[in-house]
Amino acid sequence: MATKFPKFSQALAQDPTTRRIWYGIATAHDFESHDGMTEENLYQKIFSSHFGHIAIIFLWTSGNLFHVAWQGNFEQWVAQPMKIKPIAHAIWDPHFGQPAVKAFTKGGASYPVDITFSGVYHWWYTIGMRTNNDLYNGSLFLLILSAIMLFAGWLHLQPKFKPGLSWFKNNESRLNHHLSGLFGLSSLAWTGHLIHVAIPESRGQHVGWDNFTYTLPHPAGLQPFFTGNWSVYASDPDTSNHIFGTSQGAGTAILTFLGGFHPQSQSLWLTDMAHHHLAIAIVFIIAGHMYKTNWGIGHNIKDILDAHRPPSGRLGKGHKGLYATITNSLHMQLGLALASLGVITSLVAQHMYAMPPYAFMAKDFTTQAALYTHHQYIAGFLMVGAFAHGAIFFIRDYDPEENKNNVLFRMLDHKEAIISHLSWVSLFLGFHTLGLYIHNDTMIAFGTPEKQILIEPVFAQWIQASSGKALYGFNTLLSSSSSIATKAGSSVWLPGWLEAINSNKNSLFLAIGPGDFLVHHAIALGLHTTTLILVKGALDARGSKLMPDKKDFGYSFPCDGPGRGGTCDISAWDAFYLSVFWMLNTIGWVTFYWHWKHMTIWQGNVNQFNESSTYLMGWLRDYLWLNSSPLINGYNPYGMNNLSVWAWMFLFGHLVWATGFMFLISWRGYWQELIETLAWAHERTPLANLVRWKDKPVALSIVQARLVGLVHFSVGYILTYAAFVIASTSGKFG
């Protein structure tokens, strides 16, 4: 008899119902639970899958390069980056009528195309690419790299090339290699690319495979490096009237500390970025030589952790026991990695617009909006994933004996205090923020807008002023012309910073007022509530007063049978499930705020945001409703325009989102009855009953149906907003 799916679970493979298929898919990546899985095999499988993951990423980016080179307008865009819209790829669609063909033929193309809002053109241009040939070369290189990665993944599954368990758990060696090799050397290599290729290209000097071996990136060559006269590399930077991509106004400096932005491209100075990457390379290469391996010198991480014991003794044993706990728990490691990556992704969203690294991207408003929204949503999913794996760690990997009286033990011991404080903060923020908004709504509704409660964010304004913003008149630190910091700053470090922070050509430290104060606290409410749900889920994952034996039921269970009241919806998975709704809610507020404020700034109409953002009807009417007109009018019986595809996607996103509720509200019994009725009808219908099934159809479990509902809710929510952001922004700014 042929073995049935899933091969990794004998018990599931013998299940006579459709549960076999759905549970098989659900547990396909839960390697720990597979039949005959050993710890060593688990590590080897995960290690090999990393190579596959990297191969997919390289294949995807290779495809981007290839399609732009083949069907895009990169060379035309390079000639006029401010005037021409960058093309992602051609559209072939048999449904297109003549009006559609006409509407989507744009960006200088002679056929229907998709415009890209990803910023890749700006990135490729900034790093020195100028021709379609450059793009094809990059595409081919990544394709070869992708094939090598696939081979490496396969190779590391072969008996001779499978690393042993001790290799995976050798933390010091791994840290040294990752810090020095992965971060250090790759940063050094990137510095090399910027200095040898990107900076010369930005000054109108082409450097390619044909001439890079004998083209000096700096007229003085390596002499200043070996003689210690490093300041030569910083002297003669590009001037403020430098035309990007030409020699007009160009300097010779390669490593600078100018601060601020290139006046024409409104992006960070390339020479500043080269300096930044060189500094990071040096720091990480040094960091990668800190840990003790084959030679008896350097730090031992276990010793460091064990030494972290607060001297008063009131905080228990500190970090003692963490070394073994983290080393032996993949979920703990994944949780830490996801949390770090989540924070850095949100920082990327912030810095990509406040300090754009790519030439001319600051003037492509739709790209700015799309990238901010994209990175904030990704950050949200990474953060909730971190807590999910933190909870799985507590259920599957936490050893109370190993962690006696240390920081993990004490977190669990004090969980009531932690959870109740988060609850108190969430309640305080929620009631006060909503109270202020509703008061203001009522005052506007009764025709007395002057009675609104409007609070100036004075502390935030003071922080902006101390960073150099002169607008508020605080006259403190960098915003005071007589302070030591200002005097040092204007001559020694970052002379361009003060000009940039007080310029209205960028999004650095935007002026803030009462509307910002309110939405800031609404976002704080969302963050604290999401955190409350996630922290409670992880800290109660092993057990609670209501259900002390919870850990024995695993990560996701619906209830402990009908006979034990109150045990439904309290698994760690349910906490994750609830948190995703709050995470989406919060990031919705974050992106609404960012987008509306920027839309009004770009339109030269910032008063609209300042006046309408202090009450809820203002948000609904002047942001959502007002900006949805290109989506509501995207197509009609009389014709369409080039936003019609976004209008359709806006509609489709709502549909997907609404489908989620069908699974979230009606539970398993409803579906089971429906399935049995349909099966009965099928078996009695001529012709249809010739089609039989081997597996008895049964409804999804409660947990699975919730997942299906959650996925539809999330995908629909994000798709709807993505269409809204792109259509409303590109509809106004072309």
Swiss-Prot record:
Catalytic activity: reduced [plastocyanin] + hnu + oxidized [2Fe-2S]-[ferredoxin] = oxidized [plastocyanin] + reduced [2Fe-2S]-[ferredoxin]
Annotated membrane topology: Multi-pass membrane protein
Keywords annotated in UniProt: 4Fe-4S, Chlorophyll, Chloroplast, Chromophore, Electron transport, Iron, Iron-sulfur, Magnesium, Membrane, Metal-binding, Oxidoreductase, Photosynthesis, Photosystem I, Plastid, Thylakoid, Transmembrane, Transmembrane helix, Transport
Domain of life: Eukaryota
Main subcellular location: plastid
GO BP terms, alphabetized: photosynthesis
Tagged with keyword Coiled coil: no
Positions of chlorophyll a B1 binding: 654
Transmembrane segments: 46-69, 135-158, 175-199, 273-291, 330-353, 369-395, 417-439, 517-535, 575-596, 643-665, 707-727
InterPro entries (UniProt xref): PSI_PsaA/B, PSI_PsaA/B_CS, PSI_PsaA/B_sf, PSI_PsaB
EC number: 1.97.1.12
Cofactor note (record): P700 is a chlorophyll a/chlorophyll a' dimer, A0 is one or more chlorophyll a, A1 is one or both phylloquinones and FX is a shared 4Fe-4S iron-sulfur center.
One annotated GO molecular function: chlorophyll binding
Binding site for phylloquinone: 671
A GO CC term assigned to this protein in UniProt: chloroplast thylakoid membrane
Chain sites annotated for binding [4Fe-4S] cluster: 559, 568
Pfam families in UniProt: PsaA_PsaB
Location in or out of the cell: Plastid, Chloroplast thylakoid membrane
Binding positions (chlorophyll a B3): 662, 670
Function comment: PsaA and PsaB bind P700, the primary electron donor of photosystem I (PSI), as well as the electron acceptors A0, A1 and FX. PSI is a plastocyanin/cytochrome c6-ferredoxin oxidoreductase, converting photonic excitation into a charge separation, which transfers an electron from the donor P700 chlorophyll pair to the spectroscopically characterized acceptors A0, A1, FX, FA and FB in turn. Oxidized P700 is reduced on the lumenal side of the thylakoid membrane by plastocyanin or cytochrome c6.
Family statement: Belongs to the PsaA/PsaB family.
HAMAP family with a match to the protein in the record: PSI_PsaB
Subunit structure comment from the entry: The PsaA/B heterodimer binds the P700 chlorophyll special pair and subsequent electron acceptors. PSI consists of a core antenna complex that captures photons, and an electron transfer chain that converts photonic excitation into a charge separation. The eukaryotic PSI reaction center is composed of at least 11 subunits.
Protein name: Photosystem I P700 chlorophyll a apoprotein A2
Organism: Gracilaria tenuistipitata var. liui
Gene that produces this protein: psaB
